[in-house]
Regions:
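Hydrophobic alpha-helical segments involved in membrane association or supramolecular assembly
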Residues: 1-63
Length: 63
């Protein structure tokens, strides 16, 4: 159980890093008016949210 909590903690940290990176990408794309960078930023942002809440999503799926 401790190992599982540790692994999910690491996964959450990676998700938060991706989430922050996605926010920065979206902000930079709005400044430079770059639609492709904006799309990549939103995809990174969405991936970061999914990875951050992976444990909760798995608990919802498995019940």
């Amino acid at each position: 159980n401790n190992l599982s909590d540790f692994i999910f903690g690491l996964i959450r940290a990676i998700g938060l890093i991706l989430l922050g990176f996605g926010i920065v990408q979206v902000g930079l794309s709005l400044k430079s008016h770059d639609p492709s960078q904006r799309a990549n930023g939103f995809l990174t942002l969405a991936g970061g949210v999914i990875i951050t809440f992976a444990k909760e999503i798995l608990n919802l799926i498995t019940g």
